[in-house]
């Protein structure tokens, strides 16, 4: 199993670069190979996952490929069911606020996952409770094989959530490294300073 990240290069590089080891938590998805590399995982660690070796740092060889993780760094295990990890991210952010932990939670997936109820619940809860979660939605125009126009009301998926209070929305071109770095840097600084969620 392999899900390529071509066309997602800019945003994935940026996610990994703003992820602060020791402070932040990262919940990525199966297409986030460059995110994992950019966050500091090695090519060897990714290959160990891909060939299900016992020395895979995420699962000891028990996960399917493209499920990159390094729990000791808070690069958390990937769920195959898309969108469910947004709830995990919101829960971790709630604990971070409760225990006054400095840092943010970053969660990432494709745009079609925003059609899932899990995602709505997570964004709603993070907005209501003012949680430092950065929801990164990588929009390539298709959800598996379904065109975006057949699954969402707004041309830009994040705009479906524009009515939520305490929620900042930042648009960027995920193919453009500089635009993506600017967006992710702004998102992390905003979430950290204001303790509010952001959609990128």
Named regions from a protein language model:
Residues 1-129, 136, 147-166:
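Cofactor-binding active-site loop characterized by glycine-rich and histidine/acidic residues
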Residues 23, 131, 192-196:
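Residue-level recognition of short, well-ordered coil/turn positions
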Residues 103-105, 133, 196-200:
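Residue-level recognition of the N-termini of beta-strands and the immediately preceding loop/turn
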Residues 137-199:
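Thiamine diphosphate
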